[in-house]
Amino acid sequence: NDYLNKKYNEAVFCNISTTEYFERKDGKNYSFQDFTSNPHEYKSKIRNYIYDTDMLITGHYWEPKFPKLFYPNQINEFKNLKIIGDITCDINGSIPTTIRSTSIAKPYYSIDINSMKEIDLGNKGIAVMAVDNLPSELPNESSEEFGDSIMSEVLPYLINKDDGRINRATTASKGKFYPKYKYLEDFIK
């Protein structure tokens, strides 16, 4: 993984899956199905990625049975970490800096990495964005444009004869994936 092995002078990003940030405690191979069935057998290895990271944005599904991504006693290791965007907004969940939710009007707060308590903005600490309804936020203009596009570009072809666009956009029918989407079956097993 280049993100772990190279040094950069420009901004870069890394999008990782659970296979890259969780591992079995006993060293056996990772399996997503096993991970979801036996999360207690796994531990996080995301610290390898966060060590040189300036900004961490998480959007993973989490519930208390799953391991946390990192713990308060590890946060001092992340010398460059300045901002955490916790899209999941699980208070006291997988991200220990998410101690409360924020709002669109006031989207972030600062947290002291030693006490793990909220501090005044502008003080040394980590900025945390944890807007609990962020995944459902959609600007009015985008919503209107999306609705207009559905009305003009989709609905007529659902009601009348399809010119091929509906067929091309369909991933499954009658409980079966279309051939070009068969690879998705691996994600639901």
Language model regions located:
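Short glycine/serine/threonine-rich phosphate/pyrophosphate-binding segments
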Residues: 1, 65-68, 93-94
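Glycine-rich phosphate/diphosphate-binding loop of Rossmann-like nucleotide-binding domains
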Residues: 1-52
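Structural motif
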Residues: 11-13, 54-56, 82-84, 125-129
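Glycine- and other small-residue-rich loops at beta-strand/loop junctions that grip anionic moieties
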Residues: 35, 59-61, 139
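Conserved active-site and cofactor/substrate-binding residues in soluble primary-metabolism enzymes
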Residues: 41, 51, 70-73, 141, ...
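Rossmann-fold NAD(P) dinucleotide-binding segment
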Residues: 45-58, 65-82
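Short glycine-/small-residue-rich Rossmann-like dinucleotide-binding loops
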Residues: 61-62, 88-89
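Adenosine-phosphate binding glycine-rich loop
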Residues: 83, 89-189
